[in-house]
Amino acid sequence: MRNMIPQDNENPPQQGEANQNDSVAFEDVAVNFTPDEWALLDPSQKNLYREVMQETLRNLASIEVLWKRDSLKVKVISMEKF
């Protein structure tokens, strides 16, 4: 999979591709089942679903921490210029 953040010598992302300013929420990547669909899953499928959703939530949370840290660095650097 290619890097989704364009480098200076690359073209910007095309329609449907991500760029560094796109935001992602848990709801964007979560899989939701209706009660009827959930009832059709066996216990191992339900456990797999829970594990995948928990991992997705952890991944998004870690990205948020990195984003906040990087945003803070940019603010500090900007303030140092004054």
UniProtKB/Swiss-Prot annotation:
InterPro entries: KRAB, KRAB_dom_sf, Krueppel_C2H2_ZnF. SMART domains: KRAB. Residues 1-25 are annotated as: Disordered. It comes from the Eukaryota. Residues 1-23 have a biased composition (Polar residues). GO terms for biological process: regulation of DNA-templated transcription. Residues 24-82 form the KRAB domain. GO terms for cellular component: nucleus. This is Putative KRAB domain-containing protein ZNF788. It comes from Homo sapiens (Human).
